[in-house]
Design a protein with these regions (language model features):
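Short glycine-rich hinge loops at helix-strand junctions in the catalytic core
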Residues: 67, 84, 115
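Conserved acyl-donor/pantetheine-binding loop and adjacent beta-alpha core of acyl/acetyltransferases
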Residues: 12-56, 98
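Conserved acetyl-CoA-binding loop-helix of GNAT-fold acetyltransferases
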Residues: 59, 65-78
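A short, internal acetyl-CoA/4′-phosphopantetheine-binding micro-motif in the GNAT/acyltransferase core
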Residues: 55-64, 93
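Conserved N-terminal entry element of GNAT/NAT acetyltransferase domains
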Residues: 1-9
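C-terminal "cap" of GNAT-fold acetyltransferases
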Residues: 47-48, 93-95, 101-108, 114-135
Length: 135
């Protein structure tokens, strides 16, 4: 699968897209939210300023297991390093323990219906990050 990574930045968000070279369709999307508060309480952890967090990682079903999500995450890591941002990646509880995640079942169905797999604030993002850092 041939694809390239495209970065679109706005004042508050950074979108990382994976684009199929042949069809020019977007096969993956990652969104980073920048937050410049002096102190941010996130997941009960108080951290310093210049925090960025990944809001979601979405990949097309056809792109699953092809390294697309990892490529987008690698690009995200580069961006965080370039901006000297602190990335807050917190391991999440298992899905069964995560009430918030259970409520997202409707959203999961919505994405699956349109051929997307949706990861957000879930353990798999953390796992993929570790993989992206190690490679």
């Amino acid at each position: 699968m041939n694809y390239y990574i495209e970065v679109i930045e706005t004042a508050k968000y950074c979108y990382i897209n994976a684009i199929d070279c042949n069809t020019k369709e977007r096969i993956g999307k990652l969104c980073i939210e920048f937050n410049s508060d002096d102190s941010v309480r996130y997941k009960d952890i108080c951290v310093g300023n210049n925090i960025g967090k990944i809001i979601y990682v979405i990949t097309n079903i056809s792109a699953c297991g092809k390294g697309v999500a990892t490529s987008m995450l690698k690009k995200a890591i580069e961006i965080f390093n370039d901006y000297n941002l602190y990335l807050n990646v917190v391991p999440m509880p298992r899905q069964s323990e995560n009430k918030k995640f259970r409520n997202k079942k409707g959203l999961m169905r919505f994405y699956k219906k349109f051929g997307f797999v949706h990861y957000t604030e879930d353990i798999c993002v953390t796992t993929m990050f570790r993989k992206a850092y190690l490679n």
